[in-house]
Swiss-Prot record:
Origin superkingdom: Bacteria
Active site: R176, S226 (proton donor), E296
Required cofactor(s): FAD
Encoding gene per record: murB
Name the record gives this protein: UDP-N-acetylenolpyruvoylglucosamine reductase
Annotated compartments: Cytoplasm
Protein family membership: Belongs to the MurB family.
Amino acid sequence: MIYTSLAGELQSLVKGSIQINEPMRKHTTWKIGGKADLFLNPSDKEDIRQAVEFAREKAIPITVIGNGSNLLVKDGGIRGLVIKVGRGMAKITIEGTSIKAGAGALLPELAVFACKNSLGGFGFAAGIPGSLGGAIVMNAGAMNGCVSDVLQSIVVLNERNQFEVLTKDHLNFAYRTSNLQSRGLICVETCWQGYAKDQWLIEQETKEYLAKRKAAQPQGFPNAGSVFKNPEGDFAGRLIEGCGGKGLRVGDAEVSSKHANWILNLGRATAQDVLILIDHLKQMVQERFGVLLQLEVKVLGED
């Protein structure tokens, strides 16, 4: 499919920017990935609605991403249109103890905003680099807290290309999952419920949490955080370490010697390097412990 003319048509419908053959490594925290045929940075939710309608009319596949912090894009890239819900949709406002935010805002921004307004419940978000939309899709969490604890409702673009409000009860939240993706819904706005809490206390708890997180997690190399979900009652990192997985390397992809559930990009790692390493770790853990690890990161694109 020739995307140059399609890019021009789409640009006439939206205010955000369109790129052709956009390297996806620029849009993931792993700094890995091939090119997207078409790439849209929407300026608002109407841009997304227009782009989805256009793509469906032209039979162009649609992929929606957030900050790319939990994402591995394969080396062959992504066919069709990639929509990045990002900085054009990152406004955050407050109403009483409720916070409204665009799905492109980042979790740390939400945590800082809540702290400045003396609202508790958002400490878990301080050290997670994901966007709010992406975090809701996977029910992101840390520090004994997660998205579903404080989310109130969201606005989605539904299957009929209409905006719809859904309360969190409609999202079937579970450990690191929701039903947003399987239903083909695109989160564009979010609403969160906090509670009154002393700002100084929030700041101190957040500093302590971030210090512990920094001490326990690798620093200095691109990564996607935890690669595998923790099995019930156990930790993926402990199982991988128990198999001697720390320090294993394929190409420039290496299992961190500090946290075995993290795979680092030492410089020029490819998606194939990471996938080979993932398969090897899964096999090692299953043979040693009888546990089949499940991916927490999402894999997109073509080989």
